[in-house]
Every structure is written in C-alpha cells, then in structure tokens.
Amino acid sequence: MLIADIGGTNARFALADTDAAGFSKEQTLQCADFPSVEAAIQHYLDDIGAKGPDVICLAAAGPVVGNHIKVTNNHWVLTVDDLSDAFATDAVRLMNDFEAIAYSIPVLGDGDCLPVGFPEPKPLPEGDYSVGVVGPG
C-alpha cells in the first residue's frame, strides 16, 4: 500500500503493509518539482524500484470535496479517478491530513505523546469516542 502526507511544500511517501504496523521506504519530495501528484508518485516508485501499488491512501492539506482535494498552497489537485487511472487500482482513499492524524491517536503509545499544560493526561478509554485535533492551518 502506498501512503503519503501531502502538504503545500513537501510530499512524504512510504509503503505500508496492511497486515503490520509501521511503514518503510520513506521519501520526501518537493511538490514544486512535479506537475502532479501522479508524476511525484511515479518518480517515488521508480526511485525505490517498486511496481504500481494495489492500494493508495493519501492524506493532504485541504478539504476533501467529493472525490478530490485541491491541496492548500500547492498546485496539485488529487482525484480518486486520476489516481485510479494512473495506477490501475480501484483502491484509492483520499483524506484530509488532520483526519489522518485523528486515525493515528488510538495506536499512539505513552512514548509517542508529550503533555502540554495541565491537567495531567489520562489514558484513552476503550471503545468509541470523539477525537479532536488542533493545529495550524
């Protein structure tokens, strides 16, 4: 599975295994060096010697509208259809970068967190709960 974090300046790509935690072959590319996300992905795949991915999951800075994201402070427009066509896969997921951060919260360990301010942090409850993510943007 190809995963990416796409911002206004950088696109960070990696490969992930759907059966294991973590990722490999991480690489950061400058968005301005490529005319499209598809061109950047192809460069990344060529550079690491990988074939086209079966699954693509991209998190980007910008709102998801229908099946596309216009990346904030970047000339790229990500669309499910263009990515599906370019890499011959129907398994394409686009999400906002803060949505991706929220999905990571349940798997964070104690060493992944740094308390800021007061009160002292409490462990997350088991089960379903609401998550809020605060940051710039």
Question: What does each of the following model-derived ranges do?
Answer:
Residues 1-5, 55-57, 93, 130-135:
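Short glycine-aspartate micro-motif
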Residues 1-43:
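Short glycine-rich, Thr/Ser-proximal phosphate-binding strand/loop in the N-terminal lobe
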Residues 9, 61-64, 136-137:
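Short glycine-rich anion-binding loops that position phosphate/pyrophosphate groups of nucleotides
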Residues 13, 44, 92-103, 134-137:
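Noncatalytic linker/hinge segments flanking ATPase motor cores
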Residues 18-24, 46-51, 124-126:
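Short, glycine- and charge-enriched coil/turn segments that flank and shape catalytic ligand pockets
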Residues 42-44, 80, 117-120:
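A generic local structural motif
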Residues 49-94, 99-112:
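Short beta-strand-loop/turn "lid" adjacent to the catalytic site in phosphate-handling enzymes
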Residues 103-133:
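A gly/proline- and charged-residue-enriched helix-loop-helix capping module
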